[in-house]
């Protein structure tokens, strides 16, 4: 499994269980979890604020990530560092579900992103060209949309409605920066 949440210490006495350290409701809601039988984790950057790629797939063959793709993702992290100048997260995890059985989409979080893409996205370059730009888009959202939010999209609690008058601006900028990276 993978998530932005930190495991609690000490480890649970029951094998196969996980406990997480206490967090605020806001952090909990903003921390999706990815798990699966066919699972792989790759380091994209091992700095003090690391970036990790966590992948769950319908089939084990989909986890054979092409070295060129790993290199491109590592370059994405380096280029984002150059663009933004710092990392405002403790660590970041790309949570990627490779499946042709679920709806494909991306969802930003502050210290992770949930990315559902076609099962062959990492093994077929043509499919990857279509599917994988969502990773750059969601990574940019960590800065543009989570760390800094447009007026009206930052609310004091989950009961207050968001006003998305400027949503098109921040989504457009995020899309542009994702393509640049």
Stretches found by the model and what they are:
Residues 103-106, 151-153:
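Short acidic/His/Gly/Ser-rich catalytic and metal-binding motifs that mark active-site loops
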Residues 113-181:
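Zinc-dependent metallopeptidase catalytic helix centered on the HExxH motif
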